[in-house]
Amino acid sequence: NEEDGIGNNGPVAATVKADISNNIKTRGTADNDSWTAGDAIGVYVTSAGNTKGTNVKYEYDRYGEFVSANPIYFRDNAEQTFSAYYPYIDDPNNDKFDEDGWLKNDWTIDYNKPSNTLLANDFLFASGAIASKASPMVNFTDLNNVGESLPEKDHRFKHKMSMIEFTVIAGEGIEASKSDLQSITLDKIKTQGKINVKTGATEVTGTSSLKTLPVTGFLTDVRVCKFILFPQQFENKELTISCSVLYNENTINNYTTKIPLPNGFEGGKKYTYTISVRNNSIVIGNASITGWGIGADNEFLDAEIE
């Protein structure tokens, strides 16, 4: 209105539409590649001008829309550029982030709560969406035409962490009904780091340690174990993993092998391995490193029983 000193016809609220890249299948949501009611994102206005917005919470509702109790309003007719991150971090005192968008305290991935590890730590980021008072929908979507794949047109949310996924099956010489998977352990990984909610950058911190993710069940069924990790490098370009199996209710067998990682864990990539538990070893096959989609198989890796 005229009272705002800008001379427009009154502020218009920004509405949000957000997609997750279609080849991303690892979120802890109902169908893995879309949002679930209650998911919340933090939205920023990244362009200069009268329209402001800093870490504004938009929450996905049961009707399939992002809504905000305090939405961003366009204060004039200028186009604005937006970014957003997930999961939303409440900052009522404006003291959790520095001016550049870095979370001041380390983000720690807690593997003691496996059911919540994926959803709580799947850091996503989107940027470059443009909207205005005349067209107030902020589209965190892919605006490429058919046949195009221009990064500057793809404003969808993308993963910034890394993921490693193990599928455990019974192999030769194993009675699946007597083999009860207990856990999978990663040796010497870092679970703390920084995230930047304005750029999507991550930075691993802290020291390396052994981390175990409990995943239990008899190998009569396929067992899947997933780790979300900070992107990180390894001194020896490899990672030691172990698989613990309770056999016949009285014997614990621990199998150990090493996974070559010449480039470490890279952000936005999924590392997938199939573990076949045998009578005296495990074999790792179907290994792939992808953009969290489908990749080519790599060679098998043998593992020895301890």
Question: Which ranges hold each PLM region?
Answer:
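Surface-exposed beta-strand edges and their flanking turn/coil or helix-capping segments
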Residues: 29, 97-99, 197-200, 272-273, ...
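Generic secondary-structure boundary/loop-capping signal
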Residues: 154, 158, 192, 279-281
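Exposed, polar/acidic Ser/Thr-rich sequence context and nearby capping/turn residues
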Residues: 171-172, 232-305
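Contiguous ligand/interfacial binding patches
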Residues: 181-234, 238-266
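N-terminal functional modules and adjacent low-complexity/disordered segments of proteins
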Residues: 11, 15, 38, 77, ...
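Short, low-hydrophobicity acidic/polar segments
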Residues: 2-180, 211-227, 231, 237-242, ...
